[in-house]
């Protein structure tokens, strides 16, 4: 059949509504080229490590596919000429990867964890407030 690839896409956050339509178009291209999609994950909007085109967030997608080189070339051309896709990366893999990704596992685990306490959440609620009456020292008399 074909070779195995892992593809990660960063989609412009304003285009999040069109992500499903984009995925359907890519799925059709892969399946028409006699390819298989082993894994498809929508990671949602996530913080970028650095700004891309003055954006700090993007919609992440990840696919593990098995296709011929010609189909991959068509996909990469679609990614390259689609203004909604900020970045794309296609990596050749040794075999199919159907296990859930680390990001999706950690996303699932977050629902089980209790909410973390912030530093400014103290039991009495007055962190950083001093009870000293001489803080305003002679400022009131000087006015």
Swiss-Prot record:
- GO MF, any single term: structural constituent of ribosome
Against Pfam families, the record matches this protein to:
Ribosomal_S6
Region labeled Disordered — which residues?
A: 95-143
What's a single GO CC term here? cytosolic small ribosomal subunit
Q: Name the InterPro entries on file.
A: Ribosomal_bS6, Ribosomal_bS6_sf, Ribosomal_S6_plastid/chlpt, Transl_elong_EF1B/ribsomal_bS6
Family membership, please give it: Belongs to the bacterial ribosomal protein bS6 family.
Q: What is this protein called?
A: Small ribosomal subunit protein bS6
- Organism the protein comes from: Xylella fastidiosa (strain Temecula1 / ATCC 700964)
Question: Corresponding gene?
Answer: rpsF
């Amino acid at each position: 059949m074909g070779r195995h690839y892992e593809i990660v896409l960063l989609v412009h956050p304003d285009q999040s509504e069109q992500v499903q339509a984009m995925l359907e178009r890519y799925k059709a291209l892969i399946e028409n080229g006699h390819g298989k999609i082993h894994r498809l994950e929508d990671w949602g909007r996530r913080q970028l490590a650095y700004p891309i085109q003055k954006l700090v967030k993007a919609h992440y997608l990840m696919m593990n596919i098995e296709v011929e080189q010609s189909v991959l070339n068509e996909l990469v051309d679609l990614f390259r000429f689609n203004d909604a896709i900020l970045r794309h990366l296609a990596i050749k893999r040794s075999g199919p990867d159907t296990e859930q990704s680390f990001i999706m596992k950690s996303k699932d685990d977050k629902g089980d964890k209790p909410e973390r306490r912030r530093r400014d959440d103290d039991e009495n609620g007055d962190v950083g407030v001093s009870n000293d009456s001489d803080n305003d020292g002679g400022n009131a008399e000087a006015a």
